A protein has these predicted regions:
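Helix-loop element at the rim of GNAT/NAT acetyltransferase active sites that forms part
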Residues: 26-39
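A short beta-loop-alpha structural element at the N-terminal edge
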Residues: 12-24
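A short helix-loop-beta-strand connector motif used in the catalytic cores of GNAT acetyltransferases and
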Residues: 47-58, 79
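Conserved beta-hairpin
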Residues: 55-67
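Conserved acetyl-CoA-binding loop-helix of GNAT-fold acetyltransferases
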Residues: 85, 91-104, 131
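Conserved beta-strand in the GNAT
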Residues: 64-72, 79-84
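Conserved GNAT acetyl-CoA-binding A-motif
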Residues: 99, 106-117
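Conserved beta-strand-loop-alpha-helix junction that forms the acyl-donor binding cleft
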Residues: 116-125, 144-148
Length: 151
């Protein structure tokens, strides 16, 4: 699926991630501060291959990737990771557009609910998700266990 949005300045396209996008996506994730010391983004890209690749979307403007969202679905719940838009393109509804695109794909797969994690001190992102109808799950505690160390 390709979604095209035209505005007065340029045409933006949402399409599936392709392997040749790797370097550009990694650079964008750094620019968007989506990289944390606890994960290896190159390994995340390799691990995504073969697991719901149709849910990994990039936003392209004039042949340059300016946004990403990585969705997942296990048949029970959906998950969203790596939602980000280049700082020069923020404030134009593009993150919301990417989020809606992956939500639509998840809905088409029969996904009843989406979960996501946000670092607790990332108030700007928390506000964004609250504006897009995501609610804090006060009745749930996120637990995690590392099975493979990313060095």
């Amino acid at each position: 699926m390709i979604l095209r949005v035209v505005n007065e300045l340029s045409m933006k396209t949402i399409r599936m991630y392709q392997e040749e996008d790797q370097n550009e996506v990694l650079a964008l994730w750094h620019e968007c501060n989506l990289i944390h010391s606890k994960n290896d983004p190159q390994k995340d890209l390799r691990r995504k291959k073969g697991f719901g690749e149709e849910l990994f979307l990039v936003l392209v403007n004039e042949d340059k990737i300016i946004g990403t969202v990585m969705g997942g679905y296990d048949g029970h719940r959906g998950i969203i990771n790596y939602l980000g838009v280049h700082p020069n393109f923020r404030g134009n509804g593009l993150a919301r557009m990417l989020l809606q695109a992956v939500e639509n794909k998840l809905r088409d797969l029969g996904c009843p609910q989406v979960n996501l994690s946000v670092w607790s001190d990332n108030t700007e992102v928390l506000k964004f998700y609250e504006k897009t109808d995501y609610k804090k799950a006060n009745d749930i505690v996120l637990l995690r266990k590392r099975l493979i160390e990313d060095e």
